[in-house]
């Protein structure tokens, strides 16, 4: 596995933008639960790295819309592969039933903490394909 050079918060921004292309900075800040002023610094960092592109909103010139660049999409794909490999390695000591129990418990904790799937990195149920892949590797 290669080292990922983005913080979990930056990965969360990329994940949100992959599902919501063209979201405004305000929409993004609300979705991930952070002040818009802090999000601007994160968007600046992602733009500096060439992972996102910001443009002024045509209807509201005070707003900026953010989209992933091709480099951002590629980085997110690499992060996804790395995360799946890491998860597979981490969970290989558990049976499929134990993995499901762990996922259920972690989902309950995440819900209690207000974390949202698709934004907070790693917060998602494994798909049936991922579960099958994990079982094949055992």
Short names for language-model regions:
Residues 6, 35, 72, 101, ...:
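Terminal low-complexity, poorly structured segments
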Residues 22, 44-107, 111:
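Charged, amphipathic alpha-helical coiled-coil/dimerization segments
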Residues 1-38, 49, 120-123:
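N-terminal helix-turn-helix DNA-binding core of bacterial DNA-binding proteins
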Residues 97-138:
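C-terminal regulatory/oligomerization modules of transcriptional regulators
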């Amino acid at each position: 596995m290669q080292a990922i050079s983005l913080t979990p918060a930056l990965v969360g921004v990329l994940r949100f933008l992959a599902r919501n292309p063209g979201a405004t900075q305000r929409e993004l800040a609300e979705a991930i639960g952070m002040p818009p002023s802090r999000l601007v610094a994160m968007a600046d960092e992602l733009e500096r790295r060439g992972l996102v592109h910001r443009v002024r909103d045509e209807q509201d010139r005070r707003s900026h819309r953010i989209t992933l660049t091709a480099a951002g999409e590629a980085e997110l794909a690499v992060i996804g592969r790395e995360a799946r490999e890491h998860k597979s390695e981490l969970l290989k000591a558990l049976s499929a039933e134990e993995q499901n129990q762990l996922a259920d418990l972690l989902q309950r904790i995440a819900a209690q903490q207000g974390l949202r799937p698709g934004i907070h990195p790693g917060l998602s149920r494994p798909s049936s394909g991922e579960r099958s892949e994990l079982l094949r590797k055992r």
